[in-house]
């Protein structure tokens, strides 16, 4: 509707500058799908931009190899404080690095990150010969009791969660956890993807 009425498409910005994967090399299909949903896909480097652009519907951070700078963190926090959206795709990183600023942002929303790599012990639930590319479970949308959390899902996310024909596999993953942040009473935290009970995490990267 916004595209038809205002004549412009909201933009999905893929952050660059930290060794991330790129939209043209790694996310061609995703980029095409976004256009089908009337979103424009662009790249964003916050070391050169003074602020997050006003047309940003969401910032996607695809597998950064290094942490945000303090200045970048402040820009993202200002964007989030105005109701902006952020998607952190944090693949396991075997480097001895702590994502201090990325974790700072996550902690404001009651989410913690493990420095590990998840693997599946049941051979029927992972790709042959690769225990790190495992079958996972999409959370049943009907099990999300918080209506405001449901409303926060995009049409694309909701469609995926309701598609019973999808058998998702997740490669190169780390685990995350929820904890009681100071502002916990104002948050709606909802997992969307979970491993099977036969999956475990092994230490990987960090200090």
Enumerate the predicted regions with their spans.
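Acidic, S/T/G-rich, low-cysteine, solvent-exposed domains in lumenal/extracellular/periplasmic regions
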Residues: 23-207
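Short boundary motifs at domain starts and secondary-structure transition points
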Residues: 1-8, 50, 181-182
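Hydrophobic targeting/anchoring helices
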Residues: 2-29, 33
